[in-house]
UniProtKB/Swiss-Prot annotation:
InterPro entries: Ribosomal_uS11, Ribosomal_uS11_bac-type, Ribosomal_uS11_CS, Ribosomal_uS11_sf. Part of the 30S ribosomal subunit. Interacts with proteins S7 and S18. Binds to IF-3. It comes from Streptococcus uberis (strain ATCC BAA-854 / 0140J). Belongs to the universal ribosomal protein uS11 family. Keywords: Ribonucleoprotein, Ribosomal protein, RNA-binding, rRNA-binding. This is Small ribosomal subunit protein uS11.
Length: 127
């Protein structure tokens, strides 16, 4: 039987994009898109091998942002606008890691959804 032809990853040439950082209490997901929202690269703390409570650390968020930035720079990305969503601990370190990886951060926008008193929040933890 003939070998299935592998689809080559097309190298897009995009100068500027948007870095979406989704920081939850359990994980941090960094997705880099073009200005229209088409994904160029993504990474998360869990995808890098962090498990359990280590996923929610600022260091894990930093590593996820670096990995996403590296693979986005292969497509020619140079500048990003950053949108941050969620209350997680990896918000600041992910933004710093994007800048340290060589991407120029032009704007930082907080798009955390705030309920107008919607669903009941989880009960308080008693440790």
């Amino acid at each position: 039987m003939a070998k299935p032809t592998r689809k080559r990853r097309v190298k897009k040439n995009i100068e500027s994009g948007v870095a979406h950082i989704h920081a939850t209490f359990n994980n941090t997901i960094v997705m880099i898109t073009d200005v229209h929202g088409n994904a160029l690269a993504w990474s998360s703390a869990g995808a890098l091998g962090f498990k359990g409570s280590r996923k929610s650390t600022p260091f894990a968020a930093q590593m996820a942002a670096e990995a996403a930035a590296k693979s986005a720079q292969e497509h020619g990305l140079k500048t990003v606008e950053v949108t941050v969503k969620g209350p997680g601990s990896g918000r600041e370190s992910a933004i710093r890691a994007l800048a340290a990886a060589g991407l120029e951060v032009t704007a930082i926008r907080d798009v955390t959804p705030v309920p107008h008193n919607g669903a009941r929040p989880p009960k308080r933890r008693r440790v």
